Design a protein with these regions (language model features):
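Extended hydrophobic leader/signal-anchor segments used for secretion and membrane insertion
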Residues: 1-276
Length: 276
C-alpha cells in the first residue's frame, strides 16, 4: 500500500499553527526608517488604504473593480536593526524571504527549512451586501484559493490540482467575522469564527510522497502586478466587485505556518540541529 500523509484533525492543526506575521504588532522603528510593508497593494491601484501603522486595510471597489493585497516576508538582519537605532534609513536593499521554521526560543538559528504549509487569518468586516472575497496560498509554486460570495455565504475551495468543493458559511452581506484559510498536510480548510466549515468531500490535493520530499519553492522575486505564483509572495487577499460597489476592511491579519518535522542525528552548537 502506498504511503500517505498522516493528516492532523482540524482542532489539532489549529493548536499547532505557528505565527509568522501578525499585523497587530508592527515595528514602528522599522516603519519610520523606510522598511517595506509586509502587505502591498498588488494591483498598484491604491484601492487598499492602510491605517497609519498598517494594522488594518480598507478598500472600496467600484462595480467591476478588484483590489489585491499580498504578503511578503522582509526579515531585518542584526545589521539592519543597528542602522535603524542609529537613525539611518533602511529598506532599499530589503528582499523578500521564504517562510522558514524559525522558533523564537531557538533564536540563535534563523530557521533552515522552508515551510510551504501556510494559513492566513483575519477579521473580515463587510459593509456591502454582495461582492467576493478571495484568499490564496502558494505552496511550491502551486496556488490554492478560497472564494467567498458575500451575497449568499457560499465558499468555494479550489486546489491547484483542480480539486474543488463548496461550503456554506455565515459570511453574508454586512457584518464581521474571523476567517482562516489553511493549506496544511496537502488539504485545504476554511474556518469561520474558529469553527470549521465542512465540505461534502475533503479538498485533498495529494502530492506523491517521493515527489513531495524533493519539491522546491519557487524563488522568483515578484512585484505588484505579477500573476506568477511565488513562494516569496505566498499569501493573498483579494476583493472583487461585480455589479455594485464593495467596501471591506481586513484587520488582525496573521500569517501562520505548520510545524516542520525533520530527522535529526544530534546537536551541534547550542540551538543548532543537524539534519540526517
Amino acid at each position: 500500500q502506498p504511503a500517505t500523509i498522516a493528516r492532523k484533525p482540524p482542532h489539532v492543526m489549529q493548536a499547532m499553527l505557528q505565527v509568522v506575521h501578525d499585523s497587530n504588532f508592527p515595528a514602528p522603528l522599522l516603519q519610520e526608517e523606510g522598511w517595506p510593508s509586509a502587505w502591498a497593494d498588488w494591483e498598484d491601484t491604491g484601492l487598499w488604504q492602510p491605517e497609519k501603522s498598517r494594522r488594518q486595510f480598507t478598500t472600496t471597489c467600484s462595480a467591476g473593480q478588484s483590489a489585491s493585497l499580498r504578503y511578503q516576508r522582509f526579515n531585518p538582519t542584526a545589521d539592519d536593526w543597528k542602522e535603524v537605532r542609529l537613525g539611518m534609513s533602511v529598506g532599499k536593499d530589503a528582499k523578500p524571504a521564504l517562510v522558514k521554521d524559525f522558533q523564537a526560543y531557538n533564536a540563535i538559528s534563523q530557521g533552515g527549512h522552508w515551510v510551504g504549509d501556510l494559513a492566513v487569518e483575519c477579521i473580515l468586516e463587510s459593509k456591502s451586501d454582495n461582492g467576493r472575497i478571495i484568499f490564496d496560498l502558494v505552496d511550491g509554486g502551486q496556488q490554492h484559493f478560497c472564494s467567498i460570495d458575500l451575497a449568499d455565504g457560499t465558499a468555494t475551495l479550489v486546489a491547484a490540482s483542480g480539486v474543488t468543493a463548496e461550503a456554506t458559511t455565515p459570511i453574508r452581506g454586512k457584518g464581521s467575522w474571523e476567517v482562516m484559510f489553511t493549506n496544511v498536510d496537502d488539504e485545504l480548510r476554511l474556518f469561520v469564527d474558529k469553527k470549521i466549515m465542512p465540505t461534502e468531500t475533503p479538498v485533498l490535493w495529494d502530492a506523491e510522497i517521493n515527489k513531495e520530499s524533493i519539491r522546491d519553492p519557487v524563488l522568483e522575486v515578484v512585484k505588484p502586478g505579477s500573476t506568477v505564483p511565488s513562494d516569496l509572495a505566498p499569501v493573498g487577499i483579494t476583493v472583487k466587485s461585480e455589479d455594485a460597489p464593495v467596501a471591506v476592511t481586513v484587520s488582525s491579519i496573521r500569517v501562520l505556518r505548520d510545524i516542520f518535522y525533520i530527522g535529526a542525528v544530534g546537536f551541534g552548537r547550542r540551538g543548532e540541529i543537524r539534519d540526517e
